[in-house]
Amino acid sequence: MKKILVIGESCLDRFVYCHAERLAPDLPVPVLNVIEETDNPGMAKNVERNVLSIYPHCELITNDNWKNISKTRYVHRNSNHTFIRVDAESRVPRIALHDLPLKEYDLVAISDYNKGFLTEADIQSICERHPNVFIDTKKILGGWVKDAKVIKINNFEYERSKHAITPELCERVIVTRGEQGAEYRGVLYPVPEKVDVKDSTGAGDSFFAALLVRYAETGDMDESIRFANACASKVVVQKGVTLIERPSALAYEQSKNI
């Protein structure tokens, strides 16, 4: 089996589930009564965990201080409405490029949340040194991604970067479009079935992880996008950050026939 390496910064994803039944007497804000708290590794660690949930050969290079970087969401227990997100950030040390064992892996995935772990020059260097680099980045795209195999971005990221996406680069860009599915080379790949979205947190990581796994298994990008759509559609129907599972045979076969 092919080996996957994920590179990128990680954090702690914390969900604080609450009830809110009254406003504070001194301020026009709800009083939150905490019911439950959950912690999960996030960002690049979430990509790695999703890959490992369905594929055995994946390793991660990330920042050691990831537990000091947190995203805390205060969420209404019943409606799943997020009241507020509070971020606590620490300095992320830059990666040591000379230590990267890229040749040991068949696919290299860059999960870049633009926190300082990877610069544009670092990513460009990795792409120049390996033929199969998949990128998911929060940075505005530019010439530094020209040697990537695939760049996965969402609608918002596409709008910010479209001025820099040349016709040649466009051939390597996958745009995830939420409930519509994903677009690649002018073709829209719809989700296999309409679902009731409860929480889209981490859905991009899940899509990216499933894309990596299926491409490692098949080398077929069309097949990989359909598989990623099917996996991500199973994640968004659950609360919080959840791991992907192999989609049901029926749902996945339906997606392949679209």
Residue locations for each model-derived region?
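Conserved N-terminal subdomain of the carbohydrate kinase-like
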Residues: K2-I4, L12-A109, E120-D122, E245-I258
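Active-site beta-loop-alpha junctions enriched in small/polar residues
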Residues: E89, Y113, K138-I140, F156, ...
